[in-house]
Amino acid sequence: MFEMRSANPIENFVVSKIHIRGLDFAASVENEITHMEIYESLNGLVSGMFMFKDSIGVVDTIRMTGFEAIDVEFASYVGEQANRVYQKSFRATGISRMPARTGGFETVLVRFTNNLLTLNDYVKRPYVFKKTSISNIIKAILDNLGDEKPEYEIETSLYQRDFVTKIGKPYDIIKSIVDHASTDVNNSCKFMFYEDRDSVKFASLGSIRDKEYEYIIRKGADTGDGKWTSGNTNTITALRVVVKEQSNMHEISSGLFGSRTYSHSLIRKKLTTKDVRRNDYIAQVGILNDRAHMYTNELEFASEVPETEQPLNSIQLLPNDGFYEHDNKHPLGSIHGVSLMEETYLKAKQIIVEIPGNTNITVGDVVFLDYHAVTGENHSSLDASGRWIVHELKHRVEPNSFITTLELSSDSSVNIAIAGSKK
């Protein structure tokens, strides 16, 4: 175990365990590491790597093959302030051995990921289900992995009649069916299958958007007016903020202003057309903040073309055989059209934020960014400030530093009249 103590308490952290477990031997290398990274994303499962000086001959003793179990345990805030410990077991996916140029100890790089991706390569089969839901299908696939199934939290989705999968691997099958799920709780149709700090998750973007934020991340001076920081929350000062993307023509063409879905059924020899309009989407599905990205109304930008006659930005043709019971029962039309708009809105705005290492924040959380522009009056940025979803996260640990990098995504901006509201 090693720990870092600083005059600034928020820079304290502890690495309790980095174990490599082979078939016959195990070794602790946390005191030897020179670098470790853990990656989380709403798009998949956790992966990472670490490097260490092999001063005790771990590689040859364990006879590492790149398939060992990796146990990791670390936390920000040493002592009683370690609110959430990052504790997981992974499976190594490969190693690299790099000899020292000066004749010293060699450096070993170990890459690892969630064991589900390893188990995925051992099974290939079709799945057949009757009168069930996507959430139940995912549970069944994960439970079939036996004792090595991952810990999971599955949000309930709507039922459909029957479903037959293609012949494929378990993880690949799960990734191929998540876009067919929908929920009647918040009209959300975009589900994500991902892994955060605690477990594997199957959750709708609607449930993620509705989360309360626990942390305020501030960049720039505090105005002291409390406008942006109402509520009992923790405040973090960002080390660096980079506005990655605010407006992208690709998002417009992908369905930011609306979508049309043609659903065809070879069984019933039928073609169904469903449109999703932007105002209906905002009203019934919802957004993170007060004002949808690139939104204009008739008072600001009058249009002579009625909304029902305006062209739609995205058109897709999809089969719905196997999902014919529920595909077009969403209040706004086909679930695929709503899902596409949710995904497009999620990518409308992106910001990268570096903060002192923090294991209390994980992917899928909502944070409030309080971004102050450097001007004479220290104005808060309405475009950069507001509620953001943690879309991707990277923990970077070295013997003397721990940095967490967040990639934040949002679909909207705050309105100065009601900024900071928790919805």
UniProtKB/Swiss-Prot annotation:
Keyword Ribonucleoprotein recorded: no
Main subcellular location of this protein, as a coarse class: virion
Domain of life assignment: Viruses
Annotated Gene Ontology cellular component terms: virus tail, baseplate
Induction of its expression: Expressed in the late phase of the viral replicative cycle.
Subcellular location: Virion
Record keywords: Late protein, Viral baseplate protein, Viral tail protein, Virion
Subunit structure: Homotrimer. Interacts with gp5 trimer.
Role: Baseplate protein that is part of the baseplate hub. Involved in the tail assembly.
Annotated protein name in UniProt: Probable baseplate hub protein gp334
Naturally occurring in which organism (per UniProt): Vibrio phage KVP40 (isolate Vibrio parahaemolyticus/Japan/Matsuzaki/1991) (KVP40)
